Amino acid sequence: MTTANITKHKTAKHRVLIVGGGFAGVRAARQLAGNSELEITLISKDAYFAYYPQLYHAATGGSRSEASIPLAELMGGLHVRIVNDKAMALDTKNQTLTVTSGSIFHYDDLILALGSVTNYFGIAGLQDFAYDIKTIAGAEAFKQHLHHELVERHKPEVHYVIIGGGATGVELSAAL
């Protein structure tokens, strides 16, 4: 979507509603913020942006501040309204989105940038015993597990299986 093809109303600002505060949502908001004819609202369930490349660091005992950047800081100086809430209902006919607090947002254009979720592929027990490191909460849960195993249970010879050979998997295995 370019700013040229969504600025059709001259009497009022064109309302762009972005749902999702991850990479795609933040990039869209920052890119569109330069157009003064747009009114941009970013709805995110979290007040921070989870920077995936640093989540492994937070999971293995490092500071979570490098992996968790406040959205207000990322949008500083830009004309982007940030709403910390969760989308609940979408009415495409009336072009509205309702969030869990009950607020209703009207839009002219909607960008759904909701991210991804971990797929456990129906493998029995995997969801119960695996840790995903896609969120700050997931990284924190893994960090607590590591602390419990290494410090409280005095088990320095713990073995882990890392599923995924992407950047996060490689960085995590190196950190462990």
Describe the role of every protein-language-model region.
Residues 2-81, 160-161, 170-176:
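Beta1-alpha1 glycine-rich phosphate/pyrophosphate-binding loop at the start
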Residues 1-13, 79-161:
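FAD-binding core/adjacent interface of flavoenzyme oxidoreductases
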